[in-house]
Amino acid sequence: SAKLFRENRDRIDGIIVSLPNFGFEIGIINAISVADLNVPVLVQACDDENDKVDLDSRRDAFCGKISVCNNLYQYGIPFTDTTLHTYSIYSDLLAADINKFAAICRVVNGLRHARIGAIGTRPAGFQTVRASEKLLQASGITVVPVDLSEILSAARKIEDADETLQAKLKEIRQYAAVPEQYNDKLILQAKFGVAVEQWMEANEIDAVAIQCWDSLEQNYGCAACVTMSMLSEKLIPAACEVDIAGAVSMYALTLASGRPSALLDWNNNFAEDRDKCVCTHCGNFPKSFVMNDLKLGTLGVLGRTLGKVHTFGAVYGKVKQGDFTFFRISTDDTKGCIKSYLGKGDLTDDPYGMDGCIAVTKRSEE
């Protein structure tokens, strides 16, 4: 079995161990250990039936699974358990557990060789977005940096008649409504988007974190929000403020769900309802998050300090109602590890009079 696994290494994203009976723990652990695939493992075992426990019919898979899992633990091989310790292979739980396991495989294998773009540098005043490239690299995640000036230089060199640029202009207009007074700014936005995407493609980038203020607005003349929104909608997560850990978190969520993810701040209390929190960001939500037709505009806070004419490109929208999963990693340099938190809750339909992309959230009762 180990030889068969090794011969198909490039085709195997995970291993499912199914025990119809007690099984052969030594054979199972040797096959997985010697193959050395380092992929996720799911262990499933079948039910016994109370009227079929004679010597010829009993399974003993309940006990066999405990032994197999104990061996996996002894060998330091991570494994995933099923919803119930044992159940029939004809149970609907099996399909659900396999679907969940497939998501685990996508996350593990996707992050193991992920390449995260870092365009520019983080805001000087936001040390919360600092992350350790070395700790990420230890988990197989490579950070690929580029100076923002290189992207802006590439954007400026794009000719107005360039076919790729014209396609991007059309794509943006189909993606969101553009106020007439900002039509002349749209070409700047499109050139920036093309330059970012071309750099990402050339460097095989899976997710990206962008210096979205304030050099871009001051030295080029637009915001980065719609570019990030459109990338995230294409399942290429884009995080603000060169938040590398945020980009990794978004990528993990996208791999798990197969859907766009977004970067939000836990930003405001919701009156005196302590089970709710207002989440927001300037204007980067992917289109599928938003309940209304998207409209492009200027940044709120930065529009006041930098001038609205320099901050066009923000996405305006309110997140549509539904459930959501939240996840965040951070690198702990002092302890030499990557930490994370994970939870779920609800996106409510509560009105909230704040500019930008808004999501009023409520914690899950579970």
Where do the model's predicted regions map?
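Metallocofactor- and cofactor-centric catalytic cores in central/energy metabolism, strongly enriched
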Residues: 1-109, 113-117, 122-207, 347-365
